[in-house]
Amino acid sequence: VLSSSGQTTDGRTVIRGIFRLYETEGLPLDVIFDSLISRNCIPDWKHFVQEAEDAGMKLDRILSKLDPAIADTYGPELRDVVLSRLRG
């Protein structure tokens, strides 16, 4: 389900397929994000939103699911940046 979609400038692997894993396996997002951190990976945020929209979710609902998980795992600063960029 998970696959690489590239690398960040600081060498972390960008992972896609997270929404599908979250939906099909029922794993909490913060658990998934913690696992990615331990593997020097980061979510493909745009792909997460695209998968969720493809499943019929509206952007506000998607962001409300991401908000606490990003804040708990990566901190409020990164949460603010990610959510701002996803809102466009």
Regions found by a protein language model. Name each.
Residues 1-88:
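A glycine- and charged-residue-rich anion-binding loop/surface
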